[in-house]
């Protein structure tokens, strides 16, 4: 990707890229300390920046050569917790029925959820 995201790929985008979410994704969602915004990026498409509190911006690793090279991407457990936080804070439901949770690291998921003040209800 040829832009500076000022954050890391997360939410449904990271979950889909890592095989945890079955749904087709129509935008790249990026967790950021900046403001919420949406932009069409040539060669990328729709990019949505979602503001998270600074203390919740953790748990990301370098993207692979196939998925988001040169960018940071949330671990599957962090992406799920970011999505849970977003749904809880904005008043919509987590798409539990579309998630494949069996391969997630349960310990990492619970630790991340605890650090973010979330409760896992799966």
Give the location of each predicted region.
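Short gly/ser-rich loop at a beta-strand->alpha-helix junction or flexible surface loop bordering the NTP-binding
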Residues: 1-61
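Hydrophobic alpha-helical interaction segments
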Residues: 58-122
């Amino acid at each position: 990707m040829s832009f500076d995201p000022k954050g890391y790929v997360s939410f449904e985008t990271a979950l889909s890229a890592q095989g945890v979410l079955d749904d087709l994704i129509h935008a790249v969602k990026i967790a950021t300390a900046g403001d919420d915004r949406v932009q069409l990026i040539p060669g990328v498409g729709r990019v949505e920046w979602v503001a998270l509190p600074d203390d919740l911006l953790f748990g990301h690793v370098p993207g692979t050569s196939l998925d988001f090279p040169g960018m940071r991407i949330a671990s599957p457990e962090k992406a799920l917790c970011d999505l849970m936080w977003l749904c809880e804070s904005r008043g919509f439901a987590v798409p539990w029925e579309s998630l494949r949770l069996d391969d997630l690291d349960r310990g990492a998921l619970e630790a991340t959820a605890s650090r973010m003040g979330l409760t896992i209800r799966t």
